Amino acid sequence: DRLSYNEYLSFETVGCTKQDILQLMTTIDRRFMAGLAYFLGARELGMGVARVGNGIPELQWDTISRIHSTCGMVVPSFIMKLIEFAEKNGIDYTNSSLKKCICIGEALRTPDFHLNTLGKKIQEKWSSLKLFSTYASTEMQSSFTECEYFCGGHLQPELIIVEFLDDDNNPAKEGEAGEVTITTLGVEGMPLLRFKTGDICYHFDEPCKCGRNTTRLSSVLGRKGQMIKYKGTT
């Protein structure tokens, strides 16, 4: 119930309604908990769901053509694969039924809310497609999702408590970098108390133009103690 409610709120945040048809371009198998959450949340909202799975651009476009999917749940770099396939095969993708994508797994924006290089490439090709960025982790069992104003992912305060801590474990000020630290609410199997995610972000507390008053999160600036692996050596 908690997982489905989390994604129900996320779909509402991006403006989905029961008139939308979600195309899941990600697996719900192989222990990918979020995939099941997307499906359950969409059904709770009343959306139709096409469970296509990841990869296979030809199958994705066939499904969009047949079912008229309006929203995609997708890794943003795969959108470029969809565009490349469409261009090679004469598909008029800019006039397809797909109007928005909720992007997972990869950064889409810079910390100041502008599209990053990948986001710009997608928008240059497909300007009518709305791209919504998200931030989530398995540990928090919740997500931060952008609204239509694209100025940070909104906290879902009934599901987690979030803090942003500096190197001395003091609260980071609004607009300053801080480590995302979360306390889960309503989790029974493995509840977490002030769990440090290792992700460094900015946060913003002023009310959003969408009318929500919840804390908003920037894209991830980096990882605390980030390491680069080179030829098997840390």
Regions inferred by a protein language model and the residue ranges of each:
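Active-site glycine/GP-rich loop and adjacent strand/helix microenvironment
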Residues: 45, 52-234
